[in-house]
Amino acid sequence: MSELEAIEIETAPSPSASIIWMHGLGADGHDFVDIVPELHLPARPGVRFVFPHAPMRPVTINGGYVMRAWYDIRDADGVRREDPAGVRASQKSIEALIQREKERGVLAASIVIAGFSQGGAMALQTSLRYGERLAGVMALSCSLPLADTLAAEAAPANRDVPIFMAHGTHDPMIPMARAVRARETLVGLGYRVEWHEYRMPHSVSPEEIRDVSAWLATVLTLARSS
């Protein structure tokens, strides 16, 4: 398994926290780089943002066109014919990024796993099955992959990890109903989900960025004091 290439931004020298942030289908690691200064995070702890590039692969729903994708999408609802092998391969690649951050001196408990759309789905997939406690999970405009396996595969270490989920009420790509179903599944399994809705399509909004900023500041502060 080759290591994912990634863009990195450090908010201060020798960061003691990391945010691994996955992009959506067809985008790349540059997609959310410009959001870093908009988050206005506290000067301490210093944070290393890691924006990995998904592998290039053919995507069935797009006529087999090769693009950056964390897994294949085989039908419009993304549920009936999931791509378990693709999801799990990307999970392992993201786990390798977590391991790399740990090797650079960042505790698992100071690492946030985040993502948008497919990237948000992978944030949930990876974090909730990860064997060490993480700082938090941020899942924006996404659904829950391999939902039927989560109860059996959930890691006890992250049963109470803070989860931030947000979705646009006018999202034509991933309908609100799918996101609500994901939230209900998580809540039904006992997870703590902070839920936000915004009047927007499949995108981010200034209001959402403010809420993300506040949530990140909280979980990173908690991680620093633990």
Question: What is the predicted role of each segment?
Answer:
Residues 158-163, 189-191:
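Short, proline-enriched alpha-helix->beta-strand connector loops that line the catalytic pocket
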Residues 102, 107-158:
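Primarily recognizes the serine-hydrolase "nucleophile elbow" in alpha/beta-hydrolase
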Residues 41-44, 154-160:
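Short, conserved loop/helix-junction motifs that constitute active-site signature segments
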Residues 164-167, 171:
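Short beta-strand/loop motif that positions the catalytic acidic residue
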Residues 32-37, 151, 175-185:
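Short alpha-helix in the alpha/beta-hydrolase fold that links the catalytic acid
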Residues 177-226:
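C-terminal catalytic histidine-bearing segment of alpha/beta-hydrolase fold enzymes
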Residues 52-53, 114, 138-141, 166, ...:
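Alpha/beta-hydrolase-fold catalytic nucleophile elbow
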Residues 2-112:
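Serine-hydrolase catalytic machinery in alpha/beta-hydrolase-like enzymes
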